[in-house]
Curated annotation (Swiss-Prot):
Entry's Gene Ontology cellular component terms: high-density lipoprotein particle; very-low-density lipoprotein particle
Any matching Pfam family: ApoC-I
Protein name according to UniProt: Apolipoprotein C-I
Secreted among keywords: yes
Gene3D superfamilies reported for this sequence: Apolipoprotein C-I (4.10.260.30)
Secretion signal, residue range per the UniProt entry: 1-26
GO molecular function: fatty acid binding; phospholipase inhibitor activity
Superkingdom to which the source organism belongs: Eukaryota
Organism of derivation: Tupaia glis
Gene field: APOC1
Keywords: Lipid transport, Secreted, Signal, Transport, VLDL
Subcellular location: Secreted
Length: 88
């Protein structure tokens, strides 16, 4: 009984899977893809530029660069003092 019920379900599932894509779902041809490429690249470049500018402005406004510079200065000073004490 289960086999009789599962066979029609299997056939319907296979027919849906093996069905050709509808014309609206078909992949666009290569020439139409190339026509829209410059616009998409320009939009991508503008978006990337805006995001980069925002990130740079956020870094400039934060105190992270000053903290990093101070940390490197202090650490370098400690290392320099350690070398002077060790090798003098």
């Amino acid at each position: 009984m289960r086999l009789l019920l599962s066979l029609p379900v299997l056939l319907v599932a296979l027919s849906v899977v093996l069905e050709r894509p509808a014309p609206a779902q078909a992949a666009p041809d290569f020439s139409s893809t190339l026509e829209g490429l410059p616009d998409k690249l320009k939009e991508f470049g503008n978006t990337l530029e805006d995001k980069a500018k925002k990130a740079i402005e956020r870094i400039k406004q934060s105190d992270l660069p000053a903290k990093t510079r101070n940390w490197f200065t202090e650490t370098f000073g400690k290392v320099r003092d350690t070398f002077k004490a060790t090798f003098s």
